[in-house]
């Protein structure tokens, strides 16, 4: 069944398309969208896709997500396309890509890293050191992390 038969087009907001089948809920969790924000969100799971066989789609009405916000989902949805919708038209389309730097979102896995010390208010920071597959290094202790380890 086509996605159009399941959910209609949105007027303004963001459509995350070409999510690997079955990962839409994980994408929402990573984006921190729980439903409690009051945003209208539509989820389409396991619909036909020419490129992927099957895919998931997330439609968020009334909020334009920035590349910085969505690039983090590249760990679970590297194939995702982000469409910004205004007045029912796609005005921007971009593919997710691993972020060059991630600040403040995730904890370093090294228990002795200064960012994990109880009285050190240091913001965890990770730099991208390899793009394919994405690998990050902690700016403080040098521990390497795959994006999947951080999530
Ligand atoms: N979409 C939507 N509401 C709109 C416009 C588009 O929900 N007002 C959705 C479409 O249903 C589709 C995605 O946004 O899932 C991208 O739309 P579009 O670029 O028109 O589709 P395609 O050309 O098929 O996209 P692509 O080339 O990225 O596969």
Curated annotation (Swiss-Prot):
It holds the Pfam family PyrI_C. Its cofactor is Zn(2+). Transmembrane segments: none annotated. One of its GO terms (cellular component) is aspartate carbamoyltransferase complex. It comes from the Archaea. Zn(2+) binds at residues 108, 113, 138, 141. Binds 1 zinc ion per subunit. GO terms for biological process: 'de novo' pyrimidine nucleobase biosynthetic process; pyrimidine nucleotide biosynthetic process. Keywords: Metal-binding, Pyrimidine biosynthesis, Zinc. One of its GO terms (molecular function) is metal ion binding. Involved in allosteric regulation of aspartate carbamoyltransferase. Belongs to the PyrI family. NCBIfam families: ATCase_reg. Contains catalytic and regulatory chains. This is Aspartate carbamoyltransferase regulatory chain. It comes from Pyrobaculum aerophilum (strain ATCC 51768 / DSM 7523 / JCM 9630 / CIP 104966 / NBRC 100827 / IM2). The gene is pyrI.
């Amino acid at each position: 069944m086509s996605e159009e038969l399941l959910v209609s087009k949105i007027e303004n907001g963001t459509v995350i398309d070409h999510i690997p089948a079955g990962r839409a809920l994980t994408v929402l969790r990573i984006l921190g969208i729980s439903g409690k924000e009051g945003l209208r969100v539509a989820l389409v799971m396991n619909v036909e896709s020419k490129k992927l066989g099957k895919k998931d789609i997330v439609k968020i009405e009334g909020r334009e997500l920035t590349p910085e916000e969505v690039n983090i989902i590249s760990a679970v949805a590297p194939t995702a396309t982000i469409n910004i919708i205004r007045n029912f038209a796609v005005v921007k389309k971009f593919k997710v890509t691993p972020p060059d730097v991630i600040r403040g979102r995730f904890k370093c896995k090294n228990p002795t890293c200064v960012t994990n010390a109880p009285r050190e208010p240091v913001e965890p920071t990770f730099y991208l050191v390899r793009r394919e597959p994405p690998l990050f290094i902690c700016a403080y202790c040098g521990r390497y992390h795959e994006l999947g380890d951080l999530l």
